[in-house]
């Protein structure tokens, strides 16, 4: 695939000044029992719509985008990270895309937005990386970020994920041709820079009271989700297991999935789990703030966003 990446025009070019004066909301907080969760927008990633549905016809894809008054050729992928406070632990989930990617000029805002929220990077005790794609590790690769983190920060990544990126397989992906080299470079830089901080885990790890990560595979072999559970309430941050189109079409495959068929199975299992338990769900690439519940709608699912809490 050789599609050229270009920016879709944003709703507004005037975002206001950086930091707390931004006109566009960039963070949203919820409480899960005794645990605080903040979703933070890193920005958006303009990508070809074909990457959202590699196994369906152009007509079916166009119908979905037309029904949402969206462009047929390019789609702005939301990019969200999360910050979780449990007791004395402050946990960052993913880090955004960072800088250095000229075709993603409307993302890479996470570190600035953490700072504008009053978060000192040195206060972060743990980081969970759902997977090692550049839009999840890139924020940590920005020059100067490591020096602002505490020297003993624990970075939790599944052992399968670390092993995969030693020799990644892109044979089942359908990406713009510029992306695989950038993914390899970002993953290698992340491992080299944070080798002493990475704490690999097998299938599941408890990070703090009520906060755990579990491997799902699919999107990448070591992809994980993060569960926040406290006092009978639950929220699952699903990383890249679920995309915007997948509530209506969980079987639509994504061009960034290294195992598309396994990804469909993972996606359906997570959607069923949320629908049956009533747990909240949040995702890296669902429109900000991405928090909602899942309702069953025949053979499909329906995303029910939380009502914005003013």
Which stretches of residues belong to each language-model region?
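Active-site environment of divalent metal-dependent phosphoester hydrolases
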Residues: 25-26, 46-48, 132-139, 164, ...
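Metallo-beta-lactamase
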Residues: 108, 113-119, 123, 152-215, ...
């Amino acid at each position: 695939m050789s599609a050229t990446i270009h920016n879709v025009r944003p709703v507004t070019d005037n975002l206001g000044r950086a930091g707390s004066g931004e006109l566009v909301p960039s963070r949203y907080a919820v409480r899960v029992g005794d645990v605080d969760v903040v979703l933070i927008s890193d920005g958006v990633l303009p990508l070809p719509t074909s990457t959202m549905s590699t196994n369906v016809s152009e007509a079916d894809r166009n119908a979905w985008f037309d029904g949402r008054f969206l462009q047929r050729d390019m789609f702005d992928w939301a990019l969200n990270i999360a910050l979780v406070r449990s007791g004395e632990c402050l946990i960052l989930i993913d880090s955004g895309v960072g800088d250095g990617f000229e075709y993603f000029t409307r993302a890479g805002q996470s570190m600035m937005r953490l700072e504008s929220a009053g978060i000192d990077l040195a206060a972060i005790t743990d980081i969970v990386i759902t997977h090692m794609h550049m839009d999840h590790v890139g924020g940590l690769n920005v020059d100067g970020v490591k020096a602002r983190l505490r020297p003993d920060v624990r970075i939790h990544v599944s052992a399968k994920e670390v092993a995969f990126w030693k020799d990644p397989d892109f044979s089942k992906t359908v990406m713009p041709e510029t992306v695989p080299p950038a993914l390899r470079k970002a993953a290698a830089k992340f491992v080299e820079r944070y080798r002493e901080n990475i704490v690999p885990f097998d299938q599941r790890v408890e990070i703090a009271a009520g906060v755990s990560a579990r491997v799902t595979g699919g999107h990448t072999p070591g992809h994980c989700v993060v569960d926040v559970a406290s006092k009978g309430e639950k929220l699952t941050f699903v990383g890249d297991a679920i995309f915007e189109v997948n509530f209506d079409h969980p079987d639509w495959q994504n061009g960034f999935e290294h195992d598309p068929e396994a990804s469909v199975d993972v996606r359906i299992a997570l959607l069923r789990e949320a629908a049956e338990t009533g747990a909240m769900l949040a995702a890296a690439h669902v429109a900000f703030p991405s928090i909602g519940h899942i309702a069953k709608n025949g053979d499909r699912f329906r995303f029910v966003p939380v009502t914005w809490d003013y």
